[in-house]
Amino acid sequence: SGKDVTCIARGEHLAAIRGNGLQLHSDLKGEHCLKVAAFTAEEFQGKADVIFVCVKGYSVDSITELIKRASHERTVVIPILNVYGTGPRIQRLVPGVTVLDGCIYIVGFVSGRGEITQMGKIFRLVYGAHRSTIVSRETLEAVQRDLQESGIKADISDDIDRDTFVKWSFISAMAVTGAYYDVPMGEVQKPGKVRDTFIGLSQESAALGRKLGIEFKEDIVEYNLKVIDKLAPESTASMQKDMAKGHQSEVQGLLFDMITAAEEQGIEVLTYRMVAEKFK
């Protein structure tokens, strides 16, 4: 779409993107080799109008210096992580920058050096400002326009706290169920104990959300089932992939943080406690 996009990468992925472009295999977009600018965090000296934060939750602290350096007075930062509360967390780390919050619905993974694969028909980005964040409607709509012109479904949220919690609830149930049983999502789509575990996790996070004062637009369990049933049957969560490879994973943010938050609110989470025994 002709947008000026820069990727921050490192190691063999950076070398591959610089040498061969970013290789994209996509059920939605087809096969592409994208010639995109790529730098290490240390090399990048430019200023960005919009910064999408796509690292895993455990790496957020490592990018704060880059965000500070790459921001100008009108920059907006949009985290699209899986873990709830990321926007306020980054805002505390970079108080001089406008940080929104967001989440993304997509099944994608790194399939090789400088190569990503997107599966299925889901690709939607949701973002918005927390109540204490001052940002103009014009800025929010400008970001939406750029995303839509790039073929991305983009929604401006009127309650980003709710929408990021809903995403956390979904991805937590998906990743934890998949990792606990070591199965792809096709097994969650069938009636039986795997699907029942997914439902139990969804019910428990929904109870936590209600206790936190979040007003859901629809039943969160039905919503999570609707999303899971749309996924390609062979898809797995990134936490699952990382654990299978012995890599660092998001198990803290997607499993143990949910249990901690429930404890703080006096919510009983028997299904979460059951699956947590496997990962202690």
Language-model features: where?
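Active-site-proximal catalytic alpha-helix in oxidoreductases
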Residues: 161-189, 193-206, 232-233
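N-terminal glycine-rich dinucleotide-binding loop that anchors FAD/FMN and/or NAD(P) in oxidoreductases
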Residues: 22-39, 171
